[in-house]
């Protein structure tokens, strides 16, 4: 696939307006198959940095909050009760209930934390939906801006190799910090 073909795909994407970019991130929040940075990069390339980040953020928080509300609705089902009994989930619920919303905000700010698990746990905790939405919206704005900036910089790797190296270092640091936070809050993986 050539650069010209990629540009044609972005042009087709743009012709459908902002809805495809929104739907792309909405579905990605519900079914996290590919890296979030990839979807944000697609939106930035299609709509520009500011609109791309805004559309990505709106799609991401809409999809993530939808998952949260579905889980909240199903909290008393047998399957959710079994999930709630897991040690890692109990530990995270207890931590969120004790410490409040700030640790949740910090966890959700990092692009490489398991958002699906955090959604499940938040729906099982005693956090009210409106407070979770505020934390979700603000933390995902931070996360989307970070990923959007890093994604925007991907196009300059060839012209400015030092920026590419710096971007790679920042991504690795985010990944390591996210994994450390995940281990700290969720305990061992031997469950």
UniProtKB/Swiss-Prot annotation:
Q: Name one GO cellular component term.
A: plasma membrane
Its domain of life? Bacteria
As for membrane topology, the entry says: Multi-pass membrane protein
Which InterPro entries does the record associate with it? TMEM64 (IPR015414), VTT_dom (IPR032816)
Q: Where in the cell is it found?
A: Cell membrane
Short name of one Pfam family? VTT_dom
> What biological function has been recorded for the protein in this entry?
May catalyze the transport of undecaprenyl phosphate (UndP) across the cytoplasmic membrane, from the external side to the cytoplasmic side.
**Record-stated family:** Belongs to the TVP38/TMEM64 family.
Which protein, by its recorded name, is this? Putative undecaprenyl phosphate transporter SAOUHSC_00901
Give the originating organism.
Staphylococcus aureus (strain NCTC 8325 / PS 47)
């Amino acid at each position: 696939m050539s650069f010209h073909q990629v540009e044609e795909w972005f042009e087709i994407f743009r012709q459908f307006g902002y809805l495809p970019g929104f739907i792309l991130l909405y579905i990605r929040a519900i079914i996290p198959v590919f890296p979030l940075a990839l979807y944000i990069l697609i939106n930035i390339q299609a709509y520009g940095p500011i609109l791309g980040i805004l559309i990505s953020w709106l799609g991401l928080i809409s999809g993530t909050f939808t998952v949260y509300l579905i889980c909240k609705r199903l909290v008393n089902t047998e399957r959710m009760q079994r999930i709630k009994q897991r040690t890692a989930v109990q530990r995270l619920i207890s931590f969120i209930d004790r410490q409040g919303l700030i640790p949740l905000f910090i966890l959700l700010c990092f692009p490489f934390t398991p958002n699906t698990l955090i959604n499940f746990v938040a729906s099982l905790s005693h956090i009210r939906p409106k407070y979770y939405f505020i934390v979700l919206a603000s933390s995902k704005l931070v996360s989307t801006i970070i990923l959007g900036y890093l994604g925007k910089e991907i196009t300059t790797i060839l012209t400015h190799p030092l920026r590419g190296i710096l971007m790679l270092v920042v991504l690795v640091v985010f990944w390591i910090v996210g994994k450390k936070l995940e281990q700290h809050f969720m305990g061992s993986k031997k469950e």
